Regions:
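Accessory interaction regions appended to the cores of large information-processing enzymes
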Residues: 1-318
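A short, hydrophobic C-terminal helix/tail in secreted or cell-surface proteins
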Residues: 319-323
């Protein structure tokens, strides 16, 4: 069945089946039982959200418990939709040895970094190494991992984050007299679509709607289409990446994620005084950091083609060699 897709979700550590309604669920349940003797139950499923940023920001991470040392400054910028995480460097080797820069780049790319809205994975962000510092005696490899993670988190806390949700590209074909019902349904589901196209065939006048719609709003809609068109309608859905979440406030409230309470992914830094380390909250790091900030934004408000709103920054002093 070309409409059936089986996926392994690394984030949730689950097997996901993308199916088109209750009928397909019943058929697959029966097939698994007949072939493997296993009775399976399909749950409602979960929506995998992601997060990005709306404005550029410099994030600072410092890790200095006793006999450890690393400080990292990173520039986080909004990336192109679907670009994931990109890494570059604008840091001179005179400031930080290239081996340390490569280690920072490795730590940026070695994991999915949680956002600060819902703890969902960060995506579509370009991260540039601006500066950093090591200690000739006390720095170990793990110190830069801690400083890098904290720099990303501090940057996210210091700027505006955007919640993203998965969307379908859809094609909906219905009898022409039912196109009004279809358009109303899609609008209620936060769908975006062009004007309908009309045609005829197989003794029926039909209308075709095409566009995008959030995955979260389309649960069991194929069954609904089948019901109200008496089997004459046809809905095709195909995953089409991520877009700004249509109900961000509701999702954030339901998730109940508290970035300040996430001890596994701290937003603050660790400094040392009088032979003991102490934690500095993310919004006070500027008062303790050992290196000056490198990034001074020249803000120019614009609305990009994808509809996301953020501020761009002009900076001519940065060079971006490949690490």
């Amino acid at each position: 069945d070309p409409q059936l897709h089986i996926l392994w979700n690394e984030q949730l550590q689950e097997i996901h089946a993308q199916m088109m309604g209750q009928v397909q669920i019943e058929v697959l349940t029966q097939l698994i039982k007949e072939r493997f003797g296993v009775v399976v139950v399909f749950g409602q499923g979960n929506i995998v959200y992601k997060e990005t940023i709306a404005k550029p920001v410099e994030g600072v991470g410092h890790f200095e418990p006793l006999r450890h040392y690393a400080e990292v400054h990173l520039l986080l910028e909004p990336g192109e939709p679907g670009s994931g995480i990109e890494v570059a460097s604008a840091c001179s080797e005179d400031v930080l040895d290239l081996n340390w820069q490569r280690l920072i780049a490795t730590h940026i790319m070695e994991r999915e970094h949680p956002g600060v809205l819902t703890g969902s994975a960060l995506t579509d962000v370009k991260i540039t190494i601006l500066s950093g510092r090591a200690h000739i005696k006390h720095t170990e490899g793990g110190d830069f991992r801690q400083a890098t993670y904290r720099a990303i988190r501090q940057g996210l806390k210091s700027t505006e984050s955007v919640l993203l949700e998965p969307v379908y590209a859809f094609t909906l074909e219905v009898p022409q007299e039912m196109v009004g019902r279809a358009m109303t349904d899609l609008k209620q589901r936060a769908g975006k679509f062009d004007s309908p196209e009309f045609g005829s065939g197989n003794g029926m006048d039909y209308a075709v709607l095409q566009g995008t719609v959030p995955v979260a709003t389309m649960q069991d809609y194929s069954s609904e289409v089948h019901a109200y068109t008496r089997g004459l309608g046809h809905l095709t859905l195909e995953l089409s990446g991520y877009d700004v979440c249509h109900n961000s406030e509701e999702v954030i409230a339901e998730t109940g994620y508290d970035s300040e309470a996430d001890t596994v992914n701290p937003t603050g830094s660790v400094f040392c005084a009088h032979g003991a380390g102490f934690i500095v909250p993310w919004d006070q790091v500027d008062n303790y950091m050992h290196l000056p900030r490198q990034f001074v934004p020249e803000e120019e408000t614009q609305t990009p083609a994808d509809g996301r709103s953020y501020e761009t920054v002009s900076y001519t002093h940065l060079t971006l060699p490949t690490i």
